[in-house]
C-alpha cells in the first residue's frame, strides 16, 4: 500500500537538521552519517554525501542523480549479503 498523497514525505528531524547545517556551512564534501533508512531523499539533499547504516557498517551514498529524489536512503544500502546459489559441490571440495 502506498503512502497517502496528502501526507508530506518523511525525513527524520535529525537528518533534516544535519542537511540544513551542511548546506548552511557549505560543507558539501563532508559525509553525513545517518541511521534513518526510512527517510526520503529530498531535492535539498542533492549533491550531498551520506553514510547510511545498514546494521553493521556505514554504506556510502552520494546523492548526485536527479532520479534518486523521492526514494528512501535504505534502498541504496543493502542489509543482506548474497552469497550465491549452490554450485558444483565436487569442485569446491577439492
UniProtKB/Swiss-Prot annotation:
Top-level taxonomic group? Bacteria
**Family membership noted in the UniProt record:** Belongs to the universal ribosomal protein uS19 family.
Is-annotated flag, keyword Ribonucleoprotein? yes
What is this protein's name? Small ribosomal subunit protein uS19
Q: Which organism is it from?
A: Wolbachia pipientis subsp. Culex pipiens (strain wPip)
Q: Which InterPro entries does the annotation name?
A: Ribosomal_uS19, Ribosomal_uS19_bac-type, Ribosomal_uS19_SF
Q: Is Transmembrane set as a keyword in this record?
A: no
Gene3D superfamilies to which the protein is assigned, alphabetical: 30s Ribosomal Protein S19, Chain A (3.30.860.10)
Amino acid at each position: 500500500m502506498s503512502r497517502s498523497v496528502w501526507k508530506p514525505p518523511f525525513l527524520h528531524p535529525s537528518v533534516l537538521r544535519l542537511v540544513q547545517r551542511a548546506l548552511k556551512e557549505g560543507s558539501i564534501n563532508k559525509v553525513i552519517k545517518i541511521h534513518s533508512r526510512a527517510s526520503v531523499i529530498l531535492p535539498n539533499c542533492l549533491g550531498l554525501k551520506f553514510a547510511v547504516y545498514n546494521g553493521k557498517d556505514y554504506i556510502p551514498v552520494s546523492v548526485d542523480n536527479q532520479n534518486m529524489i523521492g526514494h528512501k536512503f535504505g534502498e541504496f544500502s543493502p542489509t543482506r549479503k548474497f552469497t550465491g546459489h549452490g554450485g558444483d559441490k565436487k569442485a569446491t571440495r577439492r
